Amino acid sequence: MSTITVVIASYQYGHLAAHCIESVLCQSRKPDKILFVDDGVGDCGHLPKIYPEVEYVLREKNMGTVANFQDMLMRVTTDKCMFLGADNWLRADTLEILDKIDADVVVYDIVVTGDSKKGLHDRHGNEMTSYQGDLYWTRYKHHHGSMLYKTKLAQSIGYKGTGGKHSEEDLDLFREMKNRGAKKEWVKEGLLYYRRHRENFIKT
């Protein structure tokens, strides 16, 4: 069985992070390591006392998404890795399902929730269906930021920004993996709960 690290990344999500951490700790297939990073906000200082089994990087200064993700990626020593926004959470059998798949990168479907989910539906409605009051977002032939991938392959590519309005570091990584012939598999199950909430749109 391969080893897995889950990197939980927070920026102004300290009020939601415990929910995310709990969803990783309760996985039916436990991760071998959990790394948590607060990118210079300072709202996650309460977490180490509650969840001492998690390894923390609590930055004093903000590095920005791309540099932060790249730094955390290079800290990973397990066979596989997943990045997870601290405002989101996983279904309890996610790692068990994904770890059984022989691939360089595994993408799976998303359940979009939260009081701002409609905005995402307005842009990607052709990929979404109603699901238990939320939205089911198929990622067939696509990517997302919480895909599970082989660490050494990802580290050889690295997270890079596009320089545009959105950094798209995860899309850039996914495309380069495909360019290098990576084997990609898709799981037709909504394993990631993607929370669209007001903090997503607050500018500081």
Please place each PLM-identified region on the residue numbering.
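N-proximal low-complexity "stem/linker" segments adjacent to membrane-targeting elements
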Residues: 1-23
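Short, acidic, metal-binding catalytic loop of nucleotide-sugar glycosyltransferases
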Residues: 22-31
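A conserved acidic beta->alpha catalytic loop
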Residues: 37-46, 61, 85
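Glycine-rich, basic loop-to-helix element that forms the pyrophosphate-binding segment
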Residues: 59-76
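Short aromatic/hydrophobic "clamp" motif used to bind/position activated sugar donors
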Residues: 81
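Conserved donor NDP-sugar-binding/catalytic core segment of glycosyltransferases
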Residues: 93-121
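A recurrent flexible, glycine/aromatic-enriched loop bordering the glycosyltransferase active site
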Residues: 129-148
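Acidic donor-binding loop at a coil-to-helix junction in glycosyltransferase catalytic cores
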Residues: 165-173
